[in-house]
Amino acid sequence: VDFGSIESFPLNKFEKIMDLNVKSVFSCIQEAIKMMKSDGDEGKIITIGSIASKWTGRGGDGSYSASKYAVYGMIESIARQLHGSGSNIAVGLICPGVVDTTLTNPDKDQKPNWMRPTTIADSVLHMVTAPKNVNIFDLTIFGMDEKPW
């Protein structure tokens, strides 16, 4: 992820981040809803967002935070739209903090307190296996040594 100040951050990089983090989510959810509506109008859509959608402005990550904030707003709007129309499609969002992956930790140094990808997978499983009459909309998780606020 590119980080930079607003004065020097190139517009084309900002657009690339928005395409990757917002437009792609919109396209996937749009198609998922079409498929679910044609197959009984029920199901669960779980989106992976970021803790950056909630605790924004941590220095030079404005474009990334803005994209994740947009995803949060979009998911909330879609959830309200579906619920308001009487649909049985539930929409949820997981907002993780730092996860130990090759993207966040390219040197593969041992980060004992960072979340593992399996933590996120377990969270998805928790959301999708909730009873049909329960929708877990927002699940924010982060490592104990992460200071998001």
Regions found by a protein language model. Name each.
Residues G4-I6, P10-E15:
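Substrate-binding pocket helix/loop in short-chain dehydrogenase/reductase
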Residues F9, T56-S65, S77, D107:
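Active-site loop-to-helix junction immediately N-terminal to the catalytic Tyr of the SDR YXXXK motif
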Residues I29, S67:
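Active-site helix of classical SDR
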Residues E31-D41, S85:
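A short helix-coil junction within the Rossmann-fold of NAD(P)-dependent oxidoreductases
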Residues S50:
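Residue(s) in the substrate-gating loop at a strand-loop-helix junction
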Residues W55-T56, S77-I89:
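Active-site-adjacent segment of SDR/Rossmann-fold oxidoreductases
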